[in-house]
Design a protein with these regions (language model features):
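Sec/Tat signal peptide C-region and signal peptidase I cleavage site
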Residues: 18-22
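Extracellular/periplasmic periplasmic-binding protein-like sensory domains
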Residues: 230-303, 314-320, 369-389
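Periplasmic-binding protein-like
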Residues: 30, 87, 91-100, 120-122, ...
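Extracytoplasmic ligand/sensor domains, especially the bilobed periplasmic-binding protein
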Residues: 93-193, 242-266
Length: 389
């Protein structure tokens, strides 16, 4: 009999031992990038948001004391797998979270299912673990590539932009962004480019964009590459062509680095600092008080991850050894996060609002990402119902 990762996870879960007693604590493996590279900054922010929530919860999740076991994945799939394996075998973790590097996410999700450890992905989620590829031990409290990009593609189609040029890194996650965007945008593209990872000089790509004379450009980049691309975009005289993308193109790290070139860049995401509801206002104020700096998208994701775990542990009365009960409790969490209403779909992908944000210069001269509107309410991935867990 050949077992797929999904069927293996379901089998292991159904066979998991349960007990009638509660654990005395919950061990959370926090696997992140601490040794440099573009995922180091977001990793620190996810941890800061997670730690803030734990502090507000009195050092507990659902009433259980929390022990956080930290690990450095070095943004390497192989290193990440080794670090995760140590956490499971040596530290006996119950949950792993914190991963930002997409390659590490791909690497440890099947491993977590095999070892019956819940992987709560607090960052961007790929197609490989949702819909008909769902995994009993995999949950995503961050955002999903398809959800955000499909919402943006559908919105831009309503603006009458007939010729959009798309550009992204030539890696699986970059191609997945583009495919999701194209699926709902629908119209023929003005052009499509995949640049080499860690590209520093975009002159050749920008020349192709200029020659195509598009109505707008969709770009996926993150970290230092975002600021680098946007600055060169402006320097190439393309500033009059509207620039769109998912949240990492213009976030709390890339906007200061990009400077005035970032003005006008419009992105789609599931959170922004200026969302007006009380939960977000309290989160933003608490983060500023705790760390002396502004909250970020990544920090909100860490915060929401902790709150989801808190709700699930509370629902099972601390009996986290009952893996099936704990899984069902996670599946049923529903609460008001800083981003707005949050819950999981049947395939454990997030169901949440998607917002349009645009960079402006304030009266004080600061660059700010202002929410323009909600472009999708209670949005999730396509085909979630095909999950057969």
């Amino acid at each position: 009999m050949n077992l797929t990762p999904r069927t293996l996870a379901a089998c292991l879960l159904s066979c998991a031992m349960t007990t009638a007693w509660s654990a005395d604590k919950i061990k959370v493996g926090f696997l992140a990038t601490a040794s440099g590279g573009p995922t180091t900054g977001p990793s620190k922010d996810v941890r800061a948001g997670f730690d803030l929530a734990i502090k507000q919860l009195g050092g507990k999740l659902g009433g259980l004391p929390v022990e956080v076991v930290a690990g450095d994945d070095q943004a390497s799939p192989d290193v990440g797998k080794q670090a995760f394996d140590r956490m499971v075998k040596r530290d006996k973790i119950d949950v792993v979270t914190g991963v930002v590097a997409s390659g590490v996410i791909y690497a440890i999700a099947p491993q977590a299912a095999q070892q019956q450890v819940f992987f709560v992905n607090s960052n961007v989620g790929p197609r490989d673990f949702v819909a008909d590829k769902c995994n009993a031990f995999y949950f995503n409290t961050g955002w999903h590539i398809e959800s955000v990009n499909e919402a943006l593609g559908k919105y831009l189609a309503t603006l009458g932009l007939k010729k959009i040029f798309v550009i992204a890194a030539g890696v699986p996650v970059g191609r997945e962004h583009i495919e999701a965007f194209k699926r709902t945008y629908g119209a023929p593209l003005a052009g499509e480019i995949y640049y080499k990872p860690q590209t520093l000089d975009f002159s050749a790509e920008l020349a192709q964009i200029r020659a195509a004379k598009p109505d707008a450009v969709y770009a996926f980049a993150f970290g230092p590459l975002s600021a680098n691309f946007v600055k060169q975009y402006a320097q190439a005289g393309l500033k009059d062509i509207p620039l769109f993308g998912p949240a990492p193109l213009a976030d709390e790290d890339s906007i200061p680095a990009g400077g005035d070139a970032m003005i006008g860049v419009t992105t789609a995401g599931h959170w922004n600092f200026d969302l007006a509801h009380d939960t977000n206002k309290k989160f933003v104020a608490a983060f500023q008080k705790e760390y002396g700096k502004d909250a970020t998208l990544a920090s909100e994701q860490g915060y929401t991850t902790a709150m989801a775990l808190d709700a699930a542990v509370k629902a099972v009365g601390g009996k986290i050894e009952d893996k099936q009960a704990f899984r069902k409790a996670l599946e049923n969490v529903s609460f008001e996060a800083p981003r707005g209403p949050f819950k999981f779909n049947v395939d454990h992908s997030p169901v949440q609002n998607i917002y349009l944000r645009k960079v402006f210069k304030s009266d004080k001269g600061d660059l700010v990402n202002r929410t323009q509107k909600m472009i999708a309410a209670g949005h999730s991935v396509r085909g979630a119902s095909s999950c057969s867990m």
